Regions:
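ER/Golgi luminal nucleotide-sugar-dependent glycosyltransferases, focusing on the catalytic module
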Residues: 1-172
Length: 172
């Protein structure tokens, strides 16, 4: 933090971008290995977030402190305005809710909270099988990254709060 403000406006300025038309993406869903690729991507996402969380926790323990704020921003996303983090409740997971995700799902583009709240959010990988089963029972056989994060918070009693932060994926 510099002057109590996290500056994120410089986080993503690509030199080039490859645009994949939605029709091409939709056709990919018909490919025979699509499901296994998607599951691999989801597992990789949760594993990577968990590993980053472990590094953060090791640093906190080694230096005998807890971060006031932990911010998780997807590397391909760009916040469209400055966020004054100290205005928000750090005991909950705050997230960009401007997409109005259904069923209480938690958008995974920009998420932040105190060390404890984000520890639960970022540790979803450790409980994926149990969380998937809960999601499948509650949502008719379906689950998603957004649902898994929500269920992890529910299991550990961590609240979540959407905010109208506009976060874009520059490739779209």
């Amino acid at each position: 933090f510099r002057d109590n403000t996290l500056h994120t406006d410089y986080a993503y300025y690509p030199d080039t971008a490859r645009i994949v038309p939605w029709s091409v993406h939709w056709q990919e869903s018909e490919e025979p290995d699509y499901i296994s690729r998607m599951v691999n991507n989801w597992m990789s996402y949760h594993y990577s977030v968990n590993q980053v969380n472990l590094l953060r926790k090791e640093y906190e323990y080694a230096n005998d402190f807890k971060y006031d704020w932990v911010v998780k921003l997807r590397s391909d996303c760009e916040p469209r305005q400055k966020i004054q983090y100290e205005q928000y409740d750090k005991s909950v997971v705050n997230y960009s809710g401007w997409l109005n995700q259904p069923d209480g799902m938690i958008n995974d583009w920009l998420d932040f909270g105190g060390s404890r709240a984000m520890d639960v959010f970022m540790s979803t990988f450790n409980y994926m099988e149990i969380l998937m089963e809960r999601c499948k029972k509650e949502f008719g056989g379906a689950w998603s990254n957004e649902m898994l994060h929500r269920k992890a918070l529910d299991v550990f009693g961590i609240d979540h709060q959407p905010h109208p932060f506009i976060v874009t994926v520059p490739r779209f």
